[in-house]
Amino acid sequence: MKNYSGILSYTQSISYQLGIGENLDAFILKSNSRIMFWKNKMGLRKWFEKNRNFIWINNPQAKFDIEALNSYNNIFLNNISIFITGCNSSLIPFLKKNKFEIMKTGKEAILNLDYAHFRNKSLKEIIRIGFKHGNIIEVPYSDKIRDKLEEFKSECTHSNEPQLKYLYNDILLPSNRLFVFESENGAWLGAITVRIMDKEKVITDLILRSKMATKGTMEALIYSIFGKIKQEGFISWSLGEVPYIIYDSPKLTKEFLINFTGRRLKFAYNYLGLYNFKNKFEPEWQEVYTCGKPKLNLTTFVKAASFSNMTTLVRSKFFYNLYSSGKAFRNNEIKRKPVNSDYSKVS
């Protein structure tokens, strides 16, 4: 029995040799999603779901035949637990029919390319300021450009923090389109990668902003991409999901607890800043679901958080904030201490 662990993308350009056969590969490609296989090992993670094996499918954008996956149960030792994140509403009837448990865990920002998303005067001014500092270009894929984008990530906001993994396509693929905000001296100040979902829809993968970016950089970039793909005949553009912005869940349900807990972790993952940025373009917010079979256990979310590096990010930011608070307190105490505390010597 091989130890299956890794990730297979929706495109063949990234290949992890899992040895799982062509049929399952076809299922993965058909579902246009990312799929991860993680077989439990003895040790710290044993308690999560006992010996139940765990498959995580992220961001499926098309209906797929669940039987194509179930037929490969013999790959694993015993039972199988399927965890699907990033489901849009079109998948929900199919998943309900296949006895998945379903909960709302976020919303996706959709731009209608026939709608005036940039009519706000303050947004127009920000875009105008952005265009003063450079130009937007589309950069064709090459190995050199892929490597340059990886280097650019180290220059971006939050690059010194633990990075999330597997929640989106985090490297440039041949099937991606790359748009860059380039300064007058040729430096990259912002980058967005998108992929063509079908003849109507475009989906955002990466949104990267340099630490050196000026005001309006990302707004100008989005404005330019919007115009470009509209001219090409597309109908909608997804700016991606914002998690934890579900506020109408019945209290003390699993859906409520997941969203409530996620919002408490804003110090580590600033979902609200992400929401405010995307919301300035007046998108249509469509609900995004997380689905599980046979059911959604809270421990499965913990497992996914660990695998995606979220727990590492939370731990890092928690101790950094704790250290910063302690340092600020000590500095404040030093400032408050009088230079000469022996008042009897003051005439």
PLM regions: where:
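Short, basic/hydrophobic alpha-helical segments
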Residues: 66-77
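A conserved beta-strand-loop-helix scaffold within acyl/acetyltransferase catalytic domains
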Residues: 2-58, 83-254, 268-276, 286, ...
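A short acidic, glycine-rich active-site loop
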Residues: 260-269
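Short active-site oxyanion
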Residues: 78-82
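Short acidic, S/G/P-rich loop/turn micro-motifs used as interaction or catalytic elements
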Residues: 61-64
